[in-house]
């Protein structure tokens, strides 16, 4: 049997594992479609969408870390610093697991998903759309002389078709349920955990 090391885990194994979480979230959501609330479905979709989004960023077509390192950090080593597969693995896998645990908790307890969790997920979605729009525009202006004709940047497709649509649905849900000061504090906690990851 071949030795399995951290480098191999960071290449694609972590992404395959996170896509298994995507599959589990989608199956759970479909099985419980008639009993789960819309906010709970939204959180499950966030957990399911993050690995799909990371797959677009890293594999199909890939290259997001290069954009991030070049445009945001002006790195001398854009292929590997400061974002690389290991650092993104921690972020993506950690955030995916966090939202999966939140989903499972509220599914098991039957409690309503607080507005603060929806607000945190909405802010996360807005951040994804904003970052990918910025990188897409920056890439267009940087590389238009070399043939770039669109503002598409790696990750933009799932950012727009997934996180943008999901963010709009979650905003509608927050308007329907209302937000309290406690929800805003809870949102700050969720975003704080996400930013640490």
Task: Give, region by region, the residue ranges found by the protein language model.
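Short, Lys/Arg-rich, polar N-terminal cytosolic tail immediately upstream
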Residues: 1-8
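The first (N-terminal) embedded transmembrane alpha-helix
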Residues: 10-30
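Core segments of transmembrane alpha-helices
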Residues: 18-25, 87-106, 158-171
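Short, hydrophobic transmembrane alpha-helix segments
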Residues: 26-40
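Transmembrane alpha-helical segments that form the membrane-embedded catalytic/substrate-channel core
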Residues: 51-59, 122-137, 192-197
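Juxtamembrane helix-capping/reentrant segments at transmembrane boundaries
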Residues: 68-91
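Membrane-proximal helix-loop-helix units in multi-pass membrane proteins
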Residues: 98-161
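Terminal transmembrane helical module of multi-pass membrane proteins
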Residues: 162-197
